[in-house]
From Swiss-Prot:
InterPro entries reported in the protein's UniProt record: Urease_gamma, Urease_gamma/gamma-beta_su, Urease_gamma_sf, Urease_subunit
Pfam families: Urease_gamma
Locations listed in the record: Cytoplasm
NCBIfam families linked: PRK13241.1, urease_gam
Name this polypeptide is given: Urease subunit gamma
Lineage: Bacteria, Pseudomonadati, Pseudomonadota, Alphaproteobacteria, Hyphomicrobiales
Amino acid sequence: MNLTPREKDKLLISMAAIVARRRLERGVKLNYPEAIALISDFVVEGARDGRPVAELMEAGAHVISRDQVMEGIAEMIHDVQVEATFPDGTKLVTVHEPIR
């Protein structure tokens, strides 16, 4: 299987998001990369489903709460930017203050 660097990045984020979901199910708090992966995966999958950019920007801020991440992680993440493929092309989606 020959994958482009972008496809490899998407798979890596998706796998990290799967790990993050499993940890949340076990009650384990997420670290920085896991939190970023979970939010990014939400945006990428939402774009694939055809959800509008504005909706993903708003909904992306409700994927993870402060009590689901390790201490100090929420303060470290001010914005998450994801290049996602929508039915009408690739767009940059920015989720501001994603952990509230």
